[in-house]
From Swiss-Prot:
One of its GO terms (molecular function) is preribosome binding. Gene3D superfamilies: Translation machinery-associated protein 16-like (1.20.1440.170). The lineage of its organism: Eukaryota, Metazoa, Chordata, Craniata, Vertebrata. It comes from Bos taurus. Associates with pre-60S ribosomal particles. The modification ADP-ribosylserine is found at S9. This is Translation machinery-associated protein 16. Keywords: ADP-ribosylation, Nucleus, Ribosome biogenesis.
Length: 203
């Protein structure tokens, strides 16, 4: 009877990879790359959801009679947006004020809301808060027709509006001129004081 051929058995386990081998390093890099890819994907989805929620709020609070918004109107709408959690914060404060409750309840939710509002308020006061471009009639019309589909977000034009946009241009120009004048006076004072110091040092 012929002998069975020697060789690897069908059920033999796979060869163990040495933890410090190049193959192990390659597998580790591939796993890290996949994890990073999933991380970025989740971050993008979360960011899109947050943008979608913001745009949905603005669409729900548009004045149906307006065909276009002025900068002042847009600023007033943003002020309402920044106060959108007021009633919820009041409810949290009311629940926490009960004497029979020990410790603060809903503290994580309250902290998240306040952190979000502080960040948005800083953006609005500084370089501007990004909102749908409701100042342009065509862009406003497109935004009104949006059906909350996140895939259609690229079709919605955005623009930044800051708190100073509520001030008329004439007032802003006057304020800028005054500030520039004050800065000029300060520079002249600094130069004169430097000259005096140099003369004193030489003497």
């Amino acid at each position: 009877m012929p002998k069975a051929p020697k060789g690897k058995s069908v059920g033999q386990e796979k060869k163990v990879i040495h933890p410090y081998s190049r193959k192990a390093a390659q597998i580790t890099r591939k796993a890290h790359k996949q994890e990073k890819k999933e991380e970025l994907k989740n971050e993008k989805a979360l960011r899109l959801n947050l943008i979608g929620e913001k745009l949905q709020w603005f669409q729900n609070h548009l004045d149906p009679k307006k065909v276009g918004y002025s900068k002042r109107d847009a600023c007033e709408l943003i002020e309402r947006y920044l106060n959108r959690f007021s009633s919820e914060l009041e409810q949290i404060e009311l629940r926490n004020s009960f004497k029979d409750r020990q410790g603060r309840r809903h503290c994580s939710r309250e902290a998240a809301i306040r952190q979000t509002l502080e960040r948005e308020q800083r953006q609005y006061q500084a370089h501007g808060l990004e909102i749908p471009d409701i100042l342009n009639a065509d862009n406003l019309k497109t935004f009104r027709e949006w059906d909350f589909d996140l895939k259609k977000l690229p079709n919605i034009k955005m623009r930044k509006v800051c708190a100073s946009d509520a001030v008329p241009k004439k007032c802003k120009k006057k304020a800028v001129t005054t500030i520039d004048g004050d800065l000029g006076e300060l520079e002249l004072k600094d130069e004169s004081s430097d000259t005096d110091e140099e003369m004193t040092a030489v003497a």
